[in-house]
Amino acid sequence: MSDVAEEKAEFLVIRTYGSESFRKECADLIEKELHKLNATIARVPVGEFVAYAENAVKNETDSEAVGSSSVKRENSANDSPANTNDVDIVSSPVKRGRGRKAKNPSADADVNDTGSSPVKKGRGRPIKNPSADAGSPLVKKGRGRRAQTPAADTDAIDTASSPVKKGRGRPAKNPSADAGSPLVKKGRGRQAKNLAADTDAIDTASSPVKKGRGRPLKKTAAEADVNGLGSPSANRITGCPPSTKVSNQSSPPEPAVNESEEADEPVLKRGRSVKQPKDESESDDEDAEKAPAAIPKKRGRPGKSAIDAFFDGSD
């Protein structure tokens, strides 16, 4: 041991932090390294050593071999613990096996509360949690993405009563709250067509409505009968004259028929045409040509024969 070494005799104070099992492992490792340097070791509570050695700290590589960046090199003559402004790493988590101190942004930034925010395993970096500032409870699990709240900008949408998609704070479109129409498709914001607002003829309250849409059905035959005469086929059977009022019937009104033309046409009876009887004047002329002139035919009325007329002297 040289004189220079005697003058610069140094001692190390090594402290380890963490769980009890981790500190014991560090203690065994440090003890092995100090034995290689022929250092005198004195163990204080678990995980703390005071090592006196002549050549324990000759250069910085020896301090790195110890395995902790929290090693403090103190000179008994010059240095003092009061001059060291090191960060207290007792409360901050440290990676296992390395002496690298975990980043602790909570000391600089007052916005993030690391006490209540979840921390990733093995690092002291807190997860971003802007929901604490925005006041929105809808935050994705494990991510710091803030939920979109358009209800703050638009007063028409009530996000408290409107359905919300799973996992996002985006409210579903609900124009029915503005339009006041109860006929809205399930799960979509499409507003039902409400024709009753434009046309007064259609009563959507009493008319049947298709399922899922606000489009009313077409009028039935009972609603289309304005005159109260029933169907057009019934008018023909009963013989009622066609009405002069404009109705929704598809058949046009029947034209007027002349009586002279009606006599010549055959009469329809159960789908068959029946010949009309001939006039009496026409039948008498035809019989006169066939029968002899002396004896005319009697057609049910009293008359004289030709012989009686000859004796009487009448023509």
UniProtKB/Swiss-Prot annotation:
Q: Give an example GO cellular component term for this record.
A: nucleus
Q: What happens when the gene is disrupted?
A: RNAi-mediated knockdown significantly reduces protein levels of ATP-dependent chaperones cdc-48.1 and cdc-48.2 in embryos.
Could you mention a single GO BP entry for this protein?
A: regulation of DNA-templated transcription
Q: Does the record's keyword annotation contain Transit peptide?
A: no
Q: Which residues bind DNA?
A: 118-128
| Low complexity biased stretches | 147-160, 196-205
Q: Name one GO molecular function term.
A: transcription coregulator activity
Which compartments does it reside in?
Nucleus
Keywords, comma-separated and alphabetical: DNA-binding, Nucleus, Transcription, Transcription regulation
**Region (Disordered) residue spans:** 57-315
Biased composition, class Polar residues, residue ranges = 77-86
Respond yes or no to whether keyword DNA-binding is given for this record: yes
What's this protein's function?
Transcriptional regulator. Binds to specific sequence motifs in regulatory elements. May recruit transcription factors, or may induce structural changes in chromatin, to thereby modulate embryonic expression of ATP-dependent chaperone cdc-48.1.
Give the family from UniProt.
Belongs to the HMGA family.
- Report what the protein is called: High mobility group protein hmg-12
Q: Which organism is it from?
A: Caenorhabditis elegans
Q: Which gene encodes it?
A: hmg-12
